[in-house]
Regions:
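Sec-dependent signal peptide recognition
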Residues: 1-7
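Formylglycine-dependent sulfatase
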Residues: 2, 18-387, 394-415, 419-422, ...
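Hydrophobic h-region of N-terminal signal peptides that target proteins for export
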Residues: 8-17
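Hydrophobic residues on conserved beta-strands that form the core of alpha/beta folds
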Residues: 24, 61, 548, 559, ...
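Exposed low-complexity, polar/acidic, P/S/T/G-rich flexible segments that act as propeptides
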Residues: 568-583
């Protein structure tokens, strides 16, 4: 046989093999509460007809879980198929060194011949570097500011760089995804569509909010509007698949990244300029919220559809995890995976009824000061030294702690959880003590104690020893959030009563929506005020990614007072560490 015929047959064989692989789409929502799917029938005001249709065409998981009650770690687990604590990605402020060494499901599928594309929120490093994690195409719009992209709204190639926002971010991601489906309809593709909804800021256009008239909290109306945009986006994606004859060739996952942040009080604070607070979504009937390993924190909307392969109209009763996405995708794409590389399981044989046992013997979590295990209907939850045991078959709302009635069950689950946590990096049931916010959450949701008073406006008390000037500083989960006063400038945070022998090393990890110059200023013992010379500047870029700055304070005496300045705008701080420099 002539050499060129051999090559041709090889190419045709590879093309046929690739064409037989299913398309895979993962749709990920942001701070989306368990209740907010119309098909659940929990809340009467939510309207999600396209998501309801997706659920009816496939499976709604009664017990679907994310890997963490917070954005960054849950996304790290989803993308790698490995519990994120194995590579030291425990919270929003964690360094990404471990994640950057992991192989994502996008890389695995790209190596198997898939065209891969990412849309929306990334939150796992600089958006311009998303292609390094296996995505050929990037359209990372998650707000109304400029965003990195290497494709247009129409799915055409462009050089990677900032692109102006021309449409609402949820609409833009859906339209770009539909364009990529049209472009690659003849070959397998993997799409990761991560809508930044209904996460704050609650920026739904009026046209979406108008679908929800009547009396309700404005934050609720805005969240429902954002979810309506998500629902329309899902409708556009599924209709594009149908138009191109791809519905039965496409496996779709729809999952929330964690529960809704209620902030206990569900305060209907003004939307303008507020990128925190209650996002308007609800976790009913689950107890707890984002920032907890209670059910309300990580028991999430979870749908799977693959018409013609997975029987539709199912409600699947056994627990499943977002970790299962990578394992399922790899199996369906024919990707070989080394034993132990993935923590999830291939769900398809379970959803087809070929295997009737539960996919998991147990599911386990560790997040900051909390850890939990679910085995069957038993769930053990730990927060610091507190421990709770629930029978979720009769108490999904986690209202009745059975630890004292069933000490043998609690001990058995604790032993399993302890052994599993010893495998993580770093090991241990907890990474530190419970913060005041988490203690308030546990007191209110799990102990039934009265809710703490809502924060006064403005908050002038010290937060972890820090105060804001010309702004408001509050603690949300493990992060300090700084909101400048309206119309004012010169906002900074400050801490006094220090006793740090110089020189001093300052390490701050932050993110901000503003670009410009930041600085650390210091006052030494004996100085009556901050001297102009005692100021160390650094550059700041607007980004939703965490930025780290290490600043040397060349003090010769004792530093007693510091200030941290960033460009004017809202900012978040995960780390503010000042200590004597090593000598």
């Amino acid at each position: 046989m002539k050499p060129f015929l051999i090559v041709l047959f090889c190419i045709l064989g590879e093309f046929t093999q690739a064409a037989d692989k299913p398309n895979i789409i993962v749709i990920y929502t942001d701070d989306h509460g368990f209740a907010d799917l119309g098909i659940r029938g929990v809340e009467k005001d939510v309207k999600t007809p396209h998501l309801d249709a997706l659920a009816r065409s496939g499976v709604i998981a009664r017990h679907g879980y994310s890997t963490a009650p917070q954005c960054v770690p849950s996304r790290g687990g989803l993308m790698t198929g490995k519990f994120q604590g194995r590579f030291n990605l425990d919270n929003n402020g964690s360094a990404l060194d471990g994640f950057n060494k992991e192989t994502t499901i996008a890389t695995r599928l790209q190596n198997a011949g898939y065209t891969t594309a990412q849309f929306g929120k990334w939150h796992l490093g600089p958006q311009s570097e998303i292609p390094k994690h296996g995505f050929k195409h990037v359209y990372s719009q998650h707000g109304q500011q400029k965003f990195p992209a290497n494709i247009t709204l129409e799915g055409k190639d462009r050089p990677m760089g900032d692109m102006p926002s021309k449409v609402y971010h949820v609409d833009g991601c859906a339209k770009a995804a539909a364009s990529i489906i049209e472009r690659y309809k003849e070959q397998p593709f993997f799409l990761y569509i991560a809508f930044r909804a209904p996460h704050t800021p609650l920026d739904a256009p009026q046209s979406y909010k108008e679908r929800f008239p009547g009396e309700m909290p404005e934050r609720r109306r805005a969240a429902l509007g954002m979810l309506a945009a998500v629902d329309d986006g899902v409708g556009l994606v599924t209709s594009t698949l149908k138009k191109n004859g791809l519905s039965e060739k496409t496996l779709i996952f729809f999952i929330g990244d964690n529960g809704a942040p209620l902030k206990i009080h569900k305060t209907d604070s003004p939307l303008e300029g507020d990128a925190g607070g209650w996002d308007g979504s609800l976790n009913t009937p689950l107890n707890g919220e984002k920032g907890m390993l209670a059910e309300g924190g990580m028991h999430v909307p979870f749908l799977i559809a693959w018409p013609g392969t997975i029987p539709g109209g199912q409600t699947y009763e056994h627990p499943m995890s977002a970790l299962d996405v990578a394992a399922t995708a790899a199996a369906m794409a024919g990707v070989s995976v080394k034993p132990g590389d993935l923590d999830g399981v291939n769900l398809v044989p379970y959803l087809k009824g070929e295997i009737t046992t539960p996919p998991h013997e147990a599911l386990m979590w560790r997040w900051m000061a909390q850890s939990a295990i679910r085995e069957g209907n038993w769930k053990l939850l730990r927060g610091g030294e507190r421990e709770y045991l629930y029978d979720l078959a009769t108490d999904l709302e986690e209202k009745h702690n059975l630890a004292s009635q069933h000490p043998d069950v609690a001990a058995r689950l604790r032993t399993k959880l302890t052994a599993w946590c010893a495998e993580l990096n770093p090991p241990g049931l907890a990474l530190g003590p419970m913060s005041p916010v988490w203690n308030d959450y546990f007191d209110f949701y799990l102990e039934g104690k009265p809710a703490p008073k809502p924060e006064a406006e403005p908050n002038t008390s010290a937060t972890r020893g820090w105060l804001a000037r010309k702004g408001r500083l509050i603690e949300k989960e493990d992060v300090l959030v700084l909101t400048p006063d309206k119309g004012g400038k010169g906002t900074f945070i400050t801490r006094s009563q220090l006793k740090l022998p110089g020189p001093v090393t300052a390490k701050i990890i932050f993110k901000t929506a503003a670009t410009g110059q930041g600085a650390i200023a210091w006052r030494m013992d004996g100085d009556k005020d901050f001297l102009p010379a005692n100021r160390a500047p650094f550059e700041v870029k607007a980004s939703e990614d965490w930025q780290t700055r290490e600043v040397q304070i060349p003090a010769t005496g004792r530093v007693i007072h510091v200030r941290v300045h960033l460009p004017h705008g809202q900012a978040e701080f995960s780390t503010l560490d000042f200590k004597p420099a090593s000598r």
